[in-house]
């Protein structure tokens, strides 16, 4: 009995030890992958619940609004204009302080008050997205009585009092008072961001904790002890049962791609997740929409980052393919075919017309995001293809931080890129545009005091209208609402493609740094930091650290060179952070952004095609609530992260 018990205990311990080894191996094999669905689900549930339970919704409109017959919409406040001037009618004009050199637009006409105690009151809705500039004119004399600037809050209730100043009968005073405080519409965003950040940090810390040997040993001993006792006391622990976990069993581990840089996929996924979120509406917040003209918003960051990291991937993949001995002719054919597919898919996506009847060829939009990517990919990939040189072994062993081998080896490419940029500058600033000043970079419409209403985009807009025609361009540019532009303008137009090529080539440069100085962390980080500083200084000079007053303002619609240098500066800075954290130290696996980054084409095309379908969109109880839109957009974005994770686990990738 004693011998049988000892034999049974020894067999049980061996089985427990093998099981523990399998668990550890599985944990090492999965690594950061296993946290993917849990983190995505937590991000989804935590962000939605926190935004739902803690953030204020839309404030109910007060009785005063109903009596005045003013229905407030999102990003609006109620303004009651009190005219206390006897015998003087008023005209109130308005403009946004974000509208550069815009003409005032009429807001309301207020008749004169009939009695001293009963002023005439006119209710109007005013925008709360940016600060407002109000000008009160005497209707009869058409002279400015007063002018004031004010930042209204969403769903707030305000009064503008126009009365005689106490200092003199001929002087007019204008004051704004708050009747009812606005809601804090930015609170849902703050809560969702903090919850998401906290969950990412928590999961990363948990992974770091589980990677410690002491913690792993404690878990293994605990599991082994319980498993041993269970097997001893169980009648199923028979020695005659076939034991798959014998001493000769070696657990299978997943082979990871040692050559694949995880930070690149993480960066691509970060840009893609932000792109999905802002394309779905971004909670209808103005800073998640594209800027009206000059300046930057969150939505303006994502596309150029995607272009940048595409350039990085071009060099990494081309180097890998050619080093494996792939035929150059076959590689060139792949470049041409992929570019063609990107352009075709892009044209299909931007011209859905699913419910509007047959597609009219007269109004097909030709430019678009994937079209821009296709052309950019073709030019940059062909450029690298014809001038590609093998990376010498001595280069990867070189330790000097002052080496410029990654730049000097690419002088033909740099010469080509500088030539392209010279063409952009020449066309932008010297091409004569009928009816417009040469070198005009403005939005047209009511901008520039309304002098050039049909000059939107200057040379860029003119070239697109000349080559493609008005009907084949984007009909609702971001400048329409604020600047009241009247002509079609496409932000993915012909001239801007030159600078997207420049941006992709800067991404190629990042890829060369990663390859030329492989395993030399200090050399890589030094070069990332240097590029970040150089591009940042160029941006400072071009913009004069001003949204509108620089030599070349930052402008997403134009894809100005300052826009490219600024966003490339940001991109190098992000790689400066991601590379050591993700690939060198392994402190973060890139979850959850890594998974969409591995299936970027599928996620982008899928989110565009299925945008209006459940579960990505549903009817909201209150269409004028930022909170409800934010919840919907977070859910939709998180679902695409989950889809990308599932496809990653099933090894399903859409490659073109």
Curated annotation (Swiss-Prot):
Which residues are annotated as modified residue Phosphotyrosine in the UniProt record? 249
Residue ranges, Lumenal, vesicle compartment? 1-185, 290-295, 360-367, 435-493, 544-557, 607-627
Q: Where are the stretches annotated Disordered?
A: 1-31, 234-253
Which processes are annotated in GO (biological process)?
heparan sulfate proteoglycan catabolic process; lysosomal transport; protein complex oligomerization
The record's InterPro entries line, in alphabetical order, gives: HGSNAT_cat
The subunit structure is:
Homooligomer. Homooligomerization is necessary for enzyme activity.
Q: How does the protein associate with the membrane?
A: Multi-pass membrane protein
How is this chain modified after translation? Undergoes intralysosomal proteolytic cleavage; occurs within the end of the first and/or the beginning of the second luminal domain and is essential for the activation of the enzyme.
UniProt-annotated glycosylation sites, renumbered to this chain:
137, 157
> Modified residue Phosphoserine is at which positions?
238, 240
Query: Quick one: where is this thing mainly located?
Result: membrane
Q: Where are the transmembrane segments?
A: 186-206, 269-289, 296-316, 339-359, 368-388, 414-434, 494-514, 523-543, 558-578, 586-606, 628-648
Protein function: Lysosomal acetyltransferase that acetylates the non-reducing terminal alpha-glucosamine residue of intralysosomal heparin or heparan sulfate, converting it into a substrate for luminal alpha-N-acetyl glucosaminidase.
Q: Which GO terms describe its molecular function?
A: acyltransferase activity; heparan-alpha-glucosaminide N-acetyltransferase activity
An additional note in the Swiss-Prot or TrEMBL entry is: A signal sequence is predicted but has been shown not to be cleaved in the endoplasmic reticulum.
List keywords of the entry alphabetically. Acyltransferase, Disulfide bond, Glycoprotein, Lysosome, Membrane, Phosphoprotein, Transferase, Transmembrane, Transmembrane helix
EC annotation?
2.3.1.78
Q: Which residues form the active site?
A: 290
The protein's name:
Heparan-alpha-glucosaminide N-acetyltransferase
- EC category name: transferase
């Amino acid at each position: 009995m004693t011998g049988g018990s000892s034999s049974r205990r020894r067999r049980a311990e061996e089985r427990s030890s093998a099981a523990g080894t399998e668990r550890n191996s599985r944990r090492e094999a999965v690594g950061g992958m296993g946290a993917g669905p849990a983190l995505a689900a937590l991000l989804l549930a935590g962000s939605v619940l926190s935004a739902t339970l803690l953030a204020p919704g839309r404030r109910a409109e007060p009785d005063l609004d109903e009596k005045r017959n003013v229905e407030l919409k999102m990003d609006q406040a109620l303004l009651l204009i009190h005219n206390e001037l006897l015998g003087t009618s008023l005209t109130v004009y308005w403009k946004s302080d974000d509208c550069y050199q815009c003409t005032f637009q009429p807001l309301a006409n207020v008749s004169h008050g009939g009695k001293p105690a009963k002023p005439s009151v006119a209710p109007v809705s005013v925008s709360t997205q940016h600060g407002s500039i109000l000008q009160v004119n005497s209707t009869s004399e058409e002279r400015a009585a007063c002018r004031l600037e004010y930042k209204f809050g969403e769903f707030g209730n305000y009064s503008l009092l126009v009365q005689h100043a106490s200092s003199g009968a001929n002087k007019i005073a204008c004051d704004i008072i708050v009747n009812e405080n606005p809601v804090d519409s930015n609170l849902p965003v703050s809560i969702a961001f903090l919850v998401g950040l906290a969950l990412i940090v928590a999961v990363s810390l948990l992974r770091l904790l589980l990677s410690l040997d002491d913690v792993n040993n404690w878990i293994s001993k605990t599991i082994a002890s319980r498993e041993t006792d269970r097997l001893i006391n169980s009648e199923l622990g028979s020695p005659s049962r076939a034991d798959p976990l014998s001493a000769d069993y070696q657990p299978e581990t997943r082979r990871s791609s040692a050559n694949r840089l995880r930070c690149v996929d993480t960066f691509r996924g970060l840009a893609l997740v932000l792109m999905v979120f802002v394309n779905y509406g971004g909670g209808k917040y103005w800073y998640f929409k594209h800027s009206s003209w000059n300046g930057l918003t969150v939505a303006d960051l994502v596309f150029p980052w995607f272009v940048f990291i595409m350039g990085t991937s071009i060099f990494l993949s081309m180097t890998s393919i050619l080093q494996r001995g792939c035929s150059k002719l076959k590689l060139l054919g792949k470049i041409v075919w992929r570019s063609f597919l990107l352009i075709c898919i892009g044209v299909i996506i931007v011209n859905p017309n699913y419910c509007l009847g047959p597609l009219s060829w007269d109004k097909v939009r030709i430019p678009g995001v994937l079209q821009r990517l296709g052309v950019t990919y073709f030019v940059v990939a062909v450029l690298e293809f014809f001038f590609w040189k093998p990376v010498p072994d001595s280069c990867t062993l070189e330790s000097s931080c002052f080496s410029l081998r990654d730049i000097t080896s690419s002088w033909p490419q740099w010469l080509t890129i500088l030539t392209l940029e010279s063409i952009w500058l020449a066309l932008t600033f010297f091409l004569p545009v009928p009816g417009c000043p040469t070198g005009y970079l403005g939005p047209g419409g009511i901008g520039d005091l309304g002098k050039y209403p049909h000059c939107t985009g200057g040379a860029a807009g003119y070239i697109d209208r000349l080559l493609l025609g008005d009907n084949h361009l984007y009909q609702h540019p971001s400048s329409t609402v604020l600047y009241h532009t009247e002509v079609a303008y496409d932000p993915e137009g012909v001239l801007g493609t030159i600078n997207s090529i420049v941006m992709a080539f800067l991404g190629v440069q990042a890829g060369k740094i990663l390859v030329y100085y492989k395993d030399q962390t200090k050399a890589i980080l030094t070069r990332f930091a240097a590029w970040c500083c150089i591009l940042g200084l160029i941006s400072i000079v071009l913009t004069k650290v001003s949204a509108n007053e620089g030599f070349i303002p930052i402008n997403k619609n134009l894809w100005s060179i300052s826009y490219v240098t600024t966003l490339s500066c940001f991109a190098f800075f992000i790689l400066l952070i991601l590379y050591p954290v993700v690939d060198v130290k392994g402190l973060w696996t890139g979850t959850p952004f890594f998974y969409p980054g591995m299936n970027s084409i599928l996620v982008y095309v899928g989110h565009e095609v299925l945008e209006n379908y459940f579960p990505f969109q549903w009817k909201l109880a209150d269409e004028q609530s930022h909170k409800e839109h934010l919840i919907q957009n977070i859910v939709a974005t998180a679902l695409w992260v989950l889809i990308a994770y599932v496809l990653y686990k099933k090894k399903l990738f859409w490659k073109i």
